[in-house]
């Protein structure tokens, strides 16, 4: 008995020149998947008179074209994506919940949210209190407090409103709101992102050209200029894939077949991002190596570029993970040296989401990088190679249909 499907997937990734990224792809897509499972579970727990949920699936399923969507592998063993005790923070008989309108705030706003307790244990939670703390990335306490609890068994109870102070956060910061019921193992925590309100409209310095028409500024670039290019989505449909915030579910081939048979739009089929949090382009945009909620407007407006023509050792600053059927090298943010100039390419329409503080901060972080000495692309492309990358037909392998017993009509 051998995992023949894994052998096929490995060969495909080797042929795509990305086998060295296999573990990173698994961890980045898997950790993001765990956060998505958490969001779905908490959505259920926030629902009054909720009757339970069935999780499809806690473990990988090797059938139906291979559905490696589990937090555990096919043998019910950990894949290293999330610790069991962390999973129980949001999937337990008692779960503290923080209900808020958004995860990203500016420091001049009043961060507000409701605390609720889902109590499906065997007894009431009386004469107890919930402690909360808001800490920054260095574990410094920004604010804290307590709420009294009187929660009946089987009840979803609103226990109070939180308005943690965030005005003291002066730079872009990921903060953590921790909730815990004193004298019990029940706790939960939430990542929030705080951005400075000042300079809401990030502006480039005079030597940076920001454009959606590179042809008009190609001479400036090749002669030594710095260009931030937002390629037109409509002009490069054959060289890009759609933006997908959540991971593609089950497997791409099966649901692509279903959608095509029903004449419905096919999912972009991607699995989140992989990036280096320490890259200087992200110095003022706190992130993990995988997708999290602060990326939402950026990815929703994205159209990742297919970079298969580039050498195997080329890595985008922000790479989008493709599915095992296609294995494209996809870029959301990437850079080149072109002639004597420096080019940074962003495959997201940030103008469309400048009302979102996280999108403004991402743009600001990019500009700060381009203004610094750290902006020194090492991968050289000629103007002709750059044009081919954005206009030439992309080679794609044959993908056979995968029919399901249900027609889904």
Describe each region flagged by the PLM.
Residues 60-67, 141, 235-238, 352-353:
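Flexible loop/turn segments at secondary-structure boundaries
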Residues 193-213, 377-378:
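Low-complexity, Pro/Ser/Thr- and charge-rich linker/hinge segments at domain boundaries
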Residues 205-253, 265, 340-346, 366:
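Short alpha-beta junction capping motif
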Residues 1-134, 314-316:
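Substrate-binding clefts and catalytic carboxylate motifs of secreted carbohydrate-active enzymes
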Residues 148-151, 185-201:
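Short beta-strand elements
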Residues 359-371:
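Short amphipathic C-terminal alpha-helix that caps PH/PH-like domains
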Residues 108-150, 157-165, 172-182:
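Beta-strand-rich binding/interaction modules
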Residues 233-237, 254-357, 374-409:
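Catalytic beta-strand/loop cores that center a nucleophilic Ser/Cys/Thr
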